[in-house]
Amino acid sequence: GDIFSGILAICSTRMMKVVTSDEILDKTACDGMATMPAISADDKTTTNNSPTLLIDLGTNAEMVLFDSDQMAATSAAAGSAFDSIADVGLFGADVVAILYRLLKEHRIDCHGTLQDEWFEQGVAIEYKKQVYITQDHIRRMQLAKAAVRCGIDYLSEAFGCALQDIGQVYVAGGFGYYLDVEAAFGVGLLPDAFRGKTFACGNTALSGARVYGYDKLVIKASGNGEIHDKLFSNGSDFPKKKIINLAMEPDFNERYISYLDFSSDYEI
C-alpha cells in the first residue's frame, strides 16, 4: 500500500532511475541490461539538476517530483477515467484525444456540457460502431484531470519550485504510452508550463521490475548487504522526502473545483 509501489521508480542512494519500455525492447535481445540507458537524477552524474516529475496515470494517479536532494510524492484518485472504459471500448488516452477534438469543435462548452444536439445520446465515434462519448464519460474525465492538476500543484509547492522550473515530465503507464500530449495540454490535464518537456514513456512498471531484478541479483552476488539495503530502501535515503495526502490539504476542495472546467479559448 506504499505510494512508491505504484511508481515505476528504483530509488538508490540519492538516485532515481526511470526506464522506458522502448529501452527494454531495444536491450532484451542482448545481454546488455547492466548498461541499459536510464533517465536519472544523481548528484554525481547530473549536470542539470532541475526537478523531474514522474506521473503514472491509472485508477490511482501516482506522482513523484524529485531531484538529487529531495523527493515529494502524492496520489490522486482518478477513478476509471484513465483506465480502459469497458462500456465504450476505448482507452483513457482515446477519451482525452476525443475530448480535445470536441472542445475545438465546440460540441462541449468550457464546463464540459455537451451541446443540446448531443446531450442525450452523446457523440458518435466514427471509427467505433455504435460507440458514443456521453456526458458521463466527460464528467469522469473532468474529475480525474482536476485531481491530477491538484496533485501537480501541491507537489511543486511542497518541493518549493514553480511549475516552469520542473525540467522534465514523464507520463507512464498504458495510458501514458498512447497519450496525445498536445491533447493532454488542450483539456487541462497537464499545465502549459510543461510544454516541450513532457514525454510519454509507456509501461515503465515492467521495465523497472526487470532492472530491479537484475540489480538485486548483482548486489546479492556481491555479498554487500549494505548496498542492498540502500538500493531497496523505498526512497528513505532521500533526506528530504515528503508524502502529500491531497484530501488533508486545507484548500483542496476549492482548488479541485477550479480545475474541473476546460479552457474556453479554442479555435475551430
Regions found by a protein language model. Give the residues of each.
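Helical "lid/coupling" subdomains associated with nucleotide-phosphate turnover
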Residues: 1-45, 49-56, 62-268
